[in-house]
């Protein structure tokens, strides 16, 4: 029977994953809070102390730091000497390590954190197990992100958990532990940048970097311009997160944390033009992110309008010369690598909330046409573009999009009809190829009726209302194609 060690601070999905492992004939070992939650869910699990024959000591500071754990993880199964030594010491092989670390970054993000609290959230045993298992990836599966649970289970079931995939998991581990260690160094060095002010001039603010990874705002290379403001940093982060969703050349413009224009194209110049045309008024004074290098031709277009921040993976020398003619525009060079499914958190009175990032993308084949009329190919393209954008828009959110750009955005309204009215009234075009995209279900048929009055012929929405059929009937009445995804994307 294969053995797995599970010790996680982020409990998302761990019970379901553990149950599936037991069904796949894995014997589970765990520690502390992870073991408690598995016990409560009646998942068969043993204490790591059953491996080490040594109790947890020092309030849990020493749990897994033991040869019985690390010998079982690090043994090279192709070396008879390693296996003989394990046998002599009565040490069992460990086949899987599932670990994520104490929430150090979240802890130190609290401005009132004490030194003792920070120190107690420095994980020792977790990184040690992760690094050991990652080093031995040829024989051991290492999982650090809950987002990888399902893929691992799928591969276990179809016998495709091969060395190449385990190597990809190994890379994620070393990226994760490197960022974790860097966050610790930055905190104890006092690595925080005082900003001119916060969201408003009467608010003081500073920027604490918990990572210097090149794919993050914190790790961006600023090539030109004034110091980033508090609002610049928030807007830039939102812009970057959205533009990374696109494989094709794409441009995203953001104002006040909401996209105002998103465009794609065969070239990055086309993509920018489409984003600009989506809302040429709101882009003024905004943040723009592009997922391709900025060329001289594109730089001339960008230079012609007032922008606070321009983000790209690269700027050519000639493009920099053009853009630097404006002394204040901030130019950020950022690696466009997709973020892992890290947690995000927000402070509230007396604490903070933590959740996984909303990175889930419903595959097209899992979406369902629920109307008599099916979408055309062009309507499908419009829907899929809008569905990538809508999670980045404040709820209630309605987007209108064609297959190359957003054409109208209604954001942050207290009711869905209100959001639809704004999107429809601001639309730069409405025709048979434009889709209406909703981040949440329609509580009744009125939004669909309003869309029909404006000539909309395709709608995509999550569904889930007890009155879903009213919206479907309304769509059928007006010959509208409707697709449901089963997944909502609220953003507060």
UniProtKB/Swiss-Prot annotation:
Pathway: Purine metabolism; IMP biosynthesis via de novo pathway; 5-formamido-1-(5-phospho-D-ribosyl)imidazole-4-carboxamide from 5-amino-1-(5-phospho-D-ribosyl)imidazole-4-carboxamide (10-formyl THF route): step 1/1; Purine metabolism; IMP biosynthesis via de novo pathway; IMP from 5-formamido-1-(5-phospho-D-ribosyl)imidazole-4-carboxamide: step 1/1
Keyword Lyase on entry: no
GO MF term set: IMP cyclohydrolase activity; phosphoribosylaminoimidazolecarboxamide formyltransferase activity
SUPFAM superfamilies linked to this entry: Cytidine deaminase-like, Methylglyoxal synthase-like
PROSITE patterns attached to this UniProt entry: MGS
SMART domains in alphabetical order: AICARFT_IMPCHas (SM00798), MGS (SM00851)
HAMAP family, A to Z: PurH (MF_00139)
Protein name (database record): Bifunctional purine biosynthesis protein PurH
Phylogenetic lineage: Bacteria, Bacillati, Bacillota, Bacilli, Bacillales
Name of encoding gene: purH
């Amino acid at each position: 029977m294969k053995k797995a060690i599970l010790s996680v601070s982020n409990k998302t999905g761990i019970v379901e994953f553990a149950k599936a492992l037991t069904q796949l004939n894995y014997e589970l070992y765990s520690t502390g809070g992870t073991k408690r939650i598995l016990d409560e869910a009646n998942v068969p699990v043993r204490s790591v102390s059953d491996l080490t024959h040594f109790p947890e000591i020092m309030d849990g500071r020493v749990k897994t730091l033991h040869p019985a754990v690390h010998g079982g993880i690090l043994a090279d199964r192709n070396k008879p000497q390693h296996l003989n030594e394990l046998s002599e010491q009565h040490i069992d092989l460990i086949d899987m390590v599932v670990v994520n670390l104490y929430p150090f970054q979240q802890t130190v993000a609290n401005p009132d954190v004490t030194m003792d609290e920070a120190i107690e959230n420095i994980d020792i045993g977790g990184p040690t197990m992760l690094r050991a298992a990652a080093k031995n990836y040829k024989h051991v599966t290492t999982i650090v992100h809950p987002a990888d649970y399902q893929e691992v289970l799928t591969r276990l079931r179809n016998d495709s958990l091969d060395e190449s995939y385990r190597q990809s998991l190994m890379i994620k581990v070393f990226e994760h532990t490197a960022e974790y260690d860097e966050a610790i160094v930055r905190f104890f060095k006092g690595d925080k940048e005082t900003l001119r002010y916060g969201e408003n001039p009467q608010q003081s603010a500073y920027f604490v970097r918990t990572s210097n990874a090149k794919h993050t705002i914190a790790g961006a290379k600023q090539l030109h311009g004034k110091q980033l403001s508090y609002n610049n940093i928030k807007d830039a982060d939102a812009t970057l997160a959205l533009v990374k969703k696109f494989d094709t050349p794409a441009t995203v413009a953001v104002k006040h944390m909401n996209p105002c224009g998103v465009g794609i194209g065969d070239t990055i110049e086309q993509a920018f033009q489409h984003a600009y045309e989506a809302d040429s008024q709101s882009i003024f004074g905004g943040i723009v992110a592009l997922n391709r290098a900025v060329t001289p031709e594109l730089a001339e277009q960008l230079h012609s309008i007032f922008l606070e921040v321009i983000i790209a993976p690269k700027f050519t020398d000639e493009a920099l010369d053009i853009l630097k003619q404006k002394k204040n525009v901030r130019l950020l060079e950022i690696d466009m690598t997709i973020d892992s499914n890290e947690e995000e958190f927000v402070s509230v009175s007396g604490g903070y909330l933590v959740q996984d990032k909303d990175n889930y993308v419903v595959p097209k084949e899992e979406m369902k046409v629920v109307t008599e009329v099916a979408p055309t190919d062009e309507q499908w393209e419009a829907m899929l573009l809008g569905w990538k954008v809508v999670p980045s828009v404040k709820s209630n959110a309605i987007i209108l999009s064609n297959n190359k750009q957003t054409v109208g955005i209604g954001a942050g309204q207290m009711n869905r009809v209100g959001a639809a009215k704004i999107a429809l009234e601001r639309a730069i075009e409405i025709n048979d190829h434009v889709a209406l995209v909703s981040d949440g279900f329609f509580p009744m048929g009125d939004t669909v009726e309003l869309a029909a009055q404006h000539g909309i012929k395709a709608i995509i929405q999550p569904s889930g209302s007890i009155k879903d059929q009213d919206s479907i009937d309304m769509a059928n009445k007006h010959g509208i194609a409707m697709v449901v995804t089963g997944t909502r994307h609220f953003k507060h």
